C-alpha cells in the first residue's frame, strides 16, 4: 500500500467517526487509530494514559506519543473521540490563546 493510499484510508477512518484532524504525520495517524480502536473495544481511557481535564471533567485527553493528543468527550458514560491535535494546539486551547 502506498503512503498516499494509507493516508487516504486513515483520513476516511477519522471522517467516518467525525473526528477533526489537523495535519499530523502518518505515524501519529496510525497510533491514533490504534488508540481509538482500543477505546471502541472497551479499553478504559485511563489504561491509555488518558486524563480528565480539570477545567471540564467531561473532556478526556489521551496522549498519542509526546507531541499529539486525542480529545474525547464523556457522553453518557461512553468516551467518544472528537479531535486529534498537536500538543502545542492543545496547550493554546486550554490556556485560552487564539489559534494562528
Predicted segments with their positions:
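Enriched for short, Lys/Arg-rich terminal
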Residues: 1-11, 57-100
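A short, surface-exposed loop/turn module that caps and links secondary-structure elements
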Residues: 36-62
Amino acid at each position: 500500500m502506498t503512503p498516499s493510499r494509507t493516508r487516504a484510508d486513515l483520513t476516511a477512518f477519522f471522517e467516518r467517526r467525525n473526528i477533526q484532524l489537523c495535519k499530523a504525520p502518518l505515524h501519529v495517524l496510525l497510533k491514533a487509530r490504534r488508540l481509538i480502536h482500543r477505546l471502541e473495544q472497551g479499553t478504559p481511557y485511563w489504561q491509555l494514559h488518558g486524563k480528565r481535564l480539570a477545567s471540564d471533567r467531561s473532556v478526556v485527553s489521551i496522549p498519542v506519543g509526546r507531541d499529539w493528543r486525542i480529545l474525547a468527550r464523556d457522553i453518557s458514560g461512553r468516551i467518544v473521540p472528537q479531535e486529534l491535535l498537536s500538543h502545542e494546539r492543545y496547550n493554546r486551547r486550554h490556556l485560552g490563546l487564539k489559534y494562528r
